[in-house]
Regions:
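Short polar/acidic secondary-structure junctions
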Residues: 54-56
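Hydrophobic pocket/interface hotspot
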Residues: 20-21, 30, 49-51, 66, ...
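Generic structural detector for well-ordered beta-strands
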Residues: 10-14, 50, 65, 99
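Hydrophobic ligand-binding cavity/cleft-lining segments
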Residues: 1-38, 45
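Hydrophobic-ligand binding "helix-grip"
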Residues: 39-42, 59-105, 115
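A conserved amphipathic terminal alpha-helix motif
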Residues: 2, 109, 115-143
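Intrinsic-disorder/low-complexity, polar/charged segments enriched in Ser/Thr/Lys/Arg/Asp/Glu/Gln
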Residues: 4-10, 48, 61, 74, ...
């Protein structure tokens, strides 16, 4: 895994840390901003994660594990994408980190970071879609 290649995006959200946390861990809300993805996990350290769905006609079944949890602050997990064209070996897993930082009452900074890209081209492709996804996360959390 090449941890040097990272994609990251931050946004200020007018919501509580709890609301943003719920947006990031609630399967029904994840489905809204993650292209209809079904998410199955209990978000406990060491637990498996399964992301599955259909993206532009391609069925996917991605798998990973929860690595770190600090409720309402930090969530870190790894996953392998069945659409990556690689074997499901740990060295082909991505690492995703969500950080929620309270800026003031009712305002937080949310950061999404993904690392482990095999090429700069794949990193840029992911980064190009992050802005839209982050805006959707903000919209959901502010409801």
């Amino acid at each position: 895994m090449n941890t040097a290649l990272k994609a990251s995006q931050s946004i200020e959200i007018n919501a509580t840390c709890e609301s943003v946390w719920d947006t990031m861990t609630n399967p029904e809300k994840i489905k809204v901003y993650l292209y209809g993805t079904e998410t199955n996990t209990d978000w406990k350290v060491g637990s498996p994660i399964v992301f599955q769905g259909n993206y532009e006609g391609h069925v996917y079944n991605d798998k990973g594990n929860v690595l770190e949890v600090k409720e309402n602050e930090l969530l870190k997990y790894n996953y392998w994408s069945s659409m990556s064209g690689t074997e499901g070996k740990i060295e082909n897993y991505f690492i995703v980190t969500y950080r929620i930082e309270q800026l003031s009452e009712g305002k937080v900074k949310f950061t999404w970071q993904q690392e482990g890209f095999p090429t700069e081209e794949k990193r840029k492709h992911t980064e190009s879609g992050l802005c839209t996804m982050i805006e959707q996360i903000k919209e959901i959390a502010e409801r």
